[in-house]
Amino acid sequence: MDQSNRYANLNLKESDLIAGGRHVLCAYIMKPKAGFGNFVETAAHFAAESSTGTNVEVSTTDDFTRGVDALVYEVDEAKELMKIAYPIELFDRNVIDGRAMIASFLTLTIGNNQGMGDVEYAKMHDFYVPPAYLRLFDGPSTTIKDLWRVLGRPVVDGGFIVGTIIKPKLGLRPQPFADACYDFWLGGDFIKNDEPQGNQVFAPFKDTVRAVNDAMRRAQDATGQPKLFSFNITADDHYEMLARGEYILETFGENADHVAFLVDGYVAGPAAVTTARRAFPKQYLHYHRAGHGAVTSPQSKRGYTAFVLSKMARLQGASGIHVGTMGYGKMEGEASDRDSAFMITQDSAEGPYFKQEWLGMNPTTPIISGGMNALRMPGFFANLGHSNLIMTAGGGAFGHIDGGAAGARSLRQAEQCWKQGADPVAFAKDHREFARAFESFPNDADKLYPNWRNMLKLAAA
């Protein structure tokens, strides 16, 4: 059934929709399936299925219902682009406080429409939230400024937080795990659980928490510097998340502000993120996105992009989210990952299709991880344009030839190299840990700095 007369209005202007402030706007790349309707007809059916309609006209529809239809307002068939305006009245709100929820946003904008028989594929690439709806989201309660404050740094441009992920990701018992933390903390700032680490039979959660607390205290005594740890509290059960978080805070006592809470936000979903955000508003909320590539990968033509995921994370209240390495690490990514980092940190930012005004909502920190080491960092910082972020290098720290502490120092020296605008190989001559990174990661060194062996007078590794 052609529903374009009801669910498409190509005379609507985007500027008018934004000025009106009553619609969420979404941009999709969409292709109709062969043998079904044309582009506009398929887009209209998509809008119907995403809002007030179905595949037929139903007798219960009234004038009010038609007033909250989602409308296709722009198409470009050559670019496979369609834009849809969703009235904000369509979105579910909490009974307890009237707040908005990402679960409802996803259900409408990227729900049943992903399985429509007449759609070959459809992927959301950007969305716009009007002020009236944006104010209903929690947003972050803590930011990187809170971590800088704990570390004793300026709260403006406090700089690079040098972090790691204890490797191997599974298989360490509590004391060896804590020993690795201590080693890294002698040179670094921040350690996070890897996403599957929790309460394995060989590493009971409470034993690990106590061991890490002891390691943090010893490292702080040894260095005279504060340290940070991000604990995974992800669980299927809301009460399990609360129990984990409360035990951590009780154990760390006066160092509770040195602890972040990590949630696997993609696999556990918006409910888990909101549980952490609301139950523990004083803690830095670390959004890990494990599994997201199933829908966000450039190879996937359905779902939504990593940019969209990052934007949703800020609305939900993530203090920080992993945003990729912009093509500098081992994980799939592109230089355009920079757009995600920019969108979640600025108060006004241009996306691929929409400019978003955040109205003072706290920023979300870009967290960088996945195959990074000191040799890759100067180019990464140059691409991003600043170093106000958290970087968690697992192999990049513990793969250093002189161990985790030296690996941490090499990462910190990489930031210094970039800030000074120095040639990395020349800089290495006076910075031992950075120089030893060339020997630790010779394949990267050969690729990025072909003459390093002669310049540093080092033998082939």
From Swiss-Prot:
GO-annotated biological processes: reductive pentose-phosphate cycle
Summary of subunit composition and partner proteins: Homodimer.
Main EC class the enzyme belongs to: lyase
Keywords: Calvin cycle, Carbon dioxide fixation, Lyase, Magnesium, Metal-binding, Monooxygenase, Oxidoreductase, Photosynthesis
The protein's name in its UniProt record: Ribulose bisphosphate carboxylase
Site feature Transition state stabilizer, where: 330
Family matches, as Gene3D superfamilies: Ribulose bisphosphate carboxylase, large subunit, C-terminal domain (3.20.20.110), RuBisCO large subunit, N-terminal domain (3.30.70.150)
Superkingdom per UniProt: Bacteria
CDD domains to which the protein is assigned, alphabetical: RuBisCO_large_II
Binding site for substrate: 112, 169, 289, 322, 369
Named cofactor requirement(s): Mg(2+)
HAMAP family attached to this UniProt entry: RuBisCO_L_type2
Gene of this entry: cbbM
Other remarks in the entry: The basic functional RuBisCO is composed of a large chain homodimer in a 'head-to-tail' conformation. In contrast to form I RuBisCO, the form II RuBisCO are composed solely of large subunits.
EC numbers on record: 4.1.1.39
Active site: residue positions: 167 (proton acceptor), 288 (proton acceptor)
Chain residues that bind Mg(2+): 192, 194-195
Catalytic activity: 2 (2R)-3-phosphoglycerate + 2 H(+) = D-ribulose 1,5-bisphosphate + CO2 + H2O; D-ribulose 1,5-bisphosphate + O2 = 2-phosphoglycolate + (2R)-3-phosphoglycerate + 2 H(+)
Cofactor note: Binds 1 Mg(2+) ion per subunit.
Gene Ontology molecular functions: magnesium ion binding; monooxygenase activity; ribulose-bisphosphate carboxylase activity
Family statement: Belongs to the RuBisCO large chain family. Type II subfamily.
Job description of the protein: RuBisCO catalyzes two reactions: the carboxylation of D-ribulose 1,5-bisphosphate, the primary event in carbon dioxide fixation, as well as the oxidative fragmentation of the pentose substrate. Both reactions occur simultaneously and in competition at the same active site.
The organism of origin for this protein: Rhodopseudomonas palustris (strain BisB5)
Modification N6-carboxylysine occurs at: 192
